[in-house]
């Protein structure tokens, strides 16, 4: 069976490194499903989940919350470089829910005070928190 190597790297180091049969990501241009021997590609990722179907167990799927970044696909090696990323098993759901509530309050406050930049940052924080919650509940 053909396989790919998937590596996810953040400023904190290597977060994920496994062989995969299939990978699904969301780019700014839409969903991208990746199988072995995929054409070489570079794309910008959305804040979303990465789905990795591992080679060692066809039923085993790893879910990773990725907060944007870049994906490079070259010669059956998938490299994702992101500001931050967390595997589903490492996500603290209660912490993510607190971050979500905090971001919602910040959005409301910034909107009321017409602070556009602060509102935009809070919306990004909300999107990241929701992504972490969605991925964290997949285990």
Swiss-Prot record:
Keyword annotations from UniProtKB, A to Z: ATP synthesis, Cell membrane, CF(1), Hydrogen ion transport, Ion transport, Membrane, Transport
Keyword Lyase: no
Gene Ontology molecular function: ATP binding; proton-transporting ATP synthase activity, rotational mechanism
Membrane-topology annotation of the record: Peripheral membrane protein
The keyword Calcium belongs to this UniProt entry's keyword annotation: no
GO cellular component, one term: plasma membrane
One Pfam family here: ATP-synt_DE
Compartments (UniProt record): Cell membrane
Family to which the UniProt record says this protein belongs: Belongs to the ATPase epsilon chain family.
Function: Produces ATP from ADP in the presence of a proton gradient across the membrane.
Subunit structure: F-type ATPases have 2 components, CF(1) - the catalytic core - and CF(0) - the membrane proton channel. CF(1) has five subunits: alpha(3), beta(3), gamma(1), delta(1), epsilon(1). CF(0) has three main subunits: a, b and c.
Name under which the protein is recorded: ATP synthase epsilon chain
């Amino acid at each position: 069976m053909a396989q790919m190597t998937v590596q996810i790297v953040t400023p904190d180091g290597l977060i994920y490194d496994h062989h995969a049969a299939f990978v699904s990501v969301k780019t700014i241009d839409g969903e991208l499903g990746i199988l072995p021997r995929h054409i070489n590609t570079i794309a910008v990722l959305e804040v979303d989940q990465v789905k990795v179907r591992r080679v060692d167990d066809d039923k085993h799927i790893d879910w990773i919350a990725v907060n944007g970044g870049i994906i490079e696909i070259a010669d059956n090696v998938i490299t994702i470089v992101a500001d931050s990323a967390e595997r589903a098993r490492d996500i603290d759901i209660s912490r993510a829910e607190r971050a979500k509530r905090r971001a919602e309050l910040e959005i409301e406050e910034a909107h009321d005070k017409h602070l556009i930049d602060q509102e935009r940052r809070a919306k990004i924080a909300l999107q990241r928190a929701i992504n972490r919650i969605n991925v964290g509940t997949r285990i």
